[in-house]
């Protein structure tokens, strides 16, 4: 599994279940789920439960990722939101997940005093070449959130989904998502290909941008040539690579994609008013 001592990147599976504390070190609750913005390839929001804290009962709460900071040695996340704000927050029932669009989520961000991440720059279109962002890029969520056409998908739902190529051949499945803790981006997707192309039991780090959801088929399309996959350097399930941006640059470059932090920098520099 991914190394827990790496403070910059953690797998979604590792984050899920982590404790949440306040700035005074008091236990607040835990992270129940990460909801992924499929178009932007990042954590749209974290789903927290607070147990009986402040009489908040069994409801769940959508919290902006920016409000959480990892305290590495405590294996906990610090939530820097005032008690009163949490007390008056509108939660939701575990059987009724309401936040399925950015419009709905923007109200939650505003309530907690955060600017929605998609308003900080021009959101990049990440469909495949020659395709547009439309119904094929819409997403499904877990059963509790409905499987209509929301814009977010839980990390738990993504994990285990099948991956196919353009010819519709099964390639493998998604094993994990590695999260960049700095901004909640999906640093890379971990795929297994089984016996496809003789790739054995190794795992492979794949840029999120290389995947496109086929919503009605409940699977992801991977648009990378067979030869490229065949020659890719995988890693053993018991020996995950130390993730850093230098290593990620090599991975992204191999598959022909620009690293997400470079795209972000370009968007900021190209905003109107910037010289």
What are these regions (language model features)?
Residues 1-275:
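Peripheral interaction segments used for macromolecular assembly
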């Amino acid at each position: 599994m991914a190394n827990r001592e790496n403070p910059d990147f953690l797998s979604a599976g590792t984050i899920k279940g982590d404790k949440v504390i306040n700035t005074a070190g008091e236990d607040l609750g835990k992270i129940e789920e990460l909801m992924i913005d499929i178009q932007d390839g990042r954590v749209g929001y974290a789903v927290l439960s607070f147990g009986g804290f402040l009489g908040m009962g069994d409801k769940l709460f959508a919290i902006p990722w920016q409000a959480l900071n990892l305290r590495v040695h405590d294996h906990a996340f610090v939530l820097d939101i005032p008690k009163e704000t949490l007390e008056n927050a509108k939660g939701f029932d575990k059987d009724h997940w309401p936040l399925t669009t950015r419009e709905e989520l923007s109200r939650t961000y505003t309530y907690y005093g955060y600017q929605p991440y998609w308003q900080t720059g021009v959101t990049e279109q990440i469909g495949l070449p020659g395709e547009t962002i439309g119904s094929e890029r819409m997403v499904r969520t877990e059963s509790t959130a409905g499987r209509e056409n929301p814009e977010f998908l839980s990390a738990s739902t993504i994990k285990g989904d099948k991956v196919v190529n353009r010819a519709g051949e099964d390639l493998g499945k998604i094993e994990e998502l590695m999260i960049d803790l700095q901004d909640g981006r999906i640093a890379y997707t971990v795929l297994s290909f089984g016996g496809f192309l003789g790739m054995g039991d190794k795992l492979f780090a794949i840029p999120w941008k290389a995947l496109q959801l086929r919503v009605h088929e409940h699977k992801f399309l991977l648009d990378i040539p067979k030869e490229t996959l065949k020659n890719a350097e995988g890693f053993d399930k018991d020996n995950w690579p130390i993730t850093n941006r230098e290593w990620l640059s090599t991975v992204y470059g191999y598959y022909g994609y620009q690293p997400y932090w470079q795209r972000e920098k370009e968007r900021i520099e190209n905003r109107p008013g910037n010289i």
